[in-house]
């Protein structure tokens, strides 16, 4: 048996795919309990890997979908004695995947996975595009990313990812996971988070490009005051009229305030609103 710490169940972890395989039964049980898979639901796993979560989920339901980039792992799943007949396997990159092809009428997507940490943030931004068709998402992520997703205004972790995630979803941390739960162990702590897209957005933006732009401009200069961050777009008087304190820092602004600024800019800078952020 190999003594390498990057080999698990005969498969060598591929660094280019950011592979860290979960192998702690207690953690796996906690994740599956949080997902609570039920027969008939439209479940989708991103990056099933060697099946640590896939297998116990498969014991609860008859059919579900997996998306796997690593062709060797996809091949293993196709010939898996228990899972093979239950899985619809898409071999490819989840960041380019069109999740609308998995939509079933009256049966929203339930997406879960142990995401490669090197792509987790852009992948979540991709998934937010399908928020109307998603019931919930459960992801293993870097603990620092979960902290950012769940952060509140006025904290160091609060940033663009926070605002955009909370624009679309309720964010609920589920459990923390140590490096020892993986093969090979990552260099950081991990955590599981539940993201539940809103049926009705609490603070809808008229143009998401403006919301993204005010977030980028604010958080790229987070030590500056709001007045200085947005001086090219909004005057002190305009900020005050919108209920935004010009002397605050961007990290003190709420999601609602970012949306209010974005909507004002959309209404008053129609020509600019089509520009890419």
Curated annotation (Swiss-Prot):
Subcellular location: Cytoplasm
InterPro entries in alphabetical order: KsgA/Erm, rRNA_Ade_diMease-like_C, rRNA_Ade_Mease_Trfase_CS, rRNA_Ade_methylase_Trfase_N, rRNA_adenine_dimethylase, SAM-dependent_MTases_sf
GO cellular component: cytosol
Matching SMART domains: rADc
This protein's record includes keyword Calcium: no
Chemical reaction(s) catalysed: adenosine(1518)/adenosine(1519) in 16S rRNA + 4 S-adenosyl-L-methionine = N(6)-dimethyladenosine(1518)/N(6)-dimethyladenosine(1519) in 16S rRNA + 4 S-adenosyl-L-homocysteine + 4 H(+)
Disulfide bonds: none
Superkingdom of origin: Bacteria
Any one GO molecular-function label of the UniProt entry: RNA binding
Matching NCBIfam families: ksgA
Biological role stated in the UniProt entry: Specifically dimethylates two adjacent adenosines (A1518 and A1519) in the loop of a conserved hairpin near the 3'-end of 16S rRNA in the 30S particle. May play a critical role in biogenesis of 30S subunits.
Protein name: Ribosomal RNA small subunit methyltransferase A
Protein source organism: Aliivibrio salmonicida (strain LFI1238) (Vibrio salmonicida (strain LFI1238))
Upper lineage: Bacteria, Pseudomonadati, Pseudomonadota, Gammaproteobacteria, Vibrionales
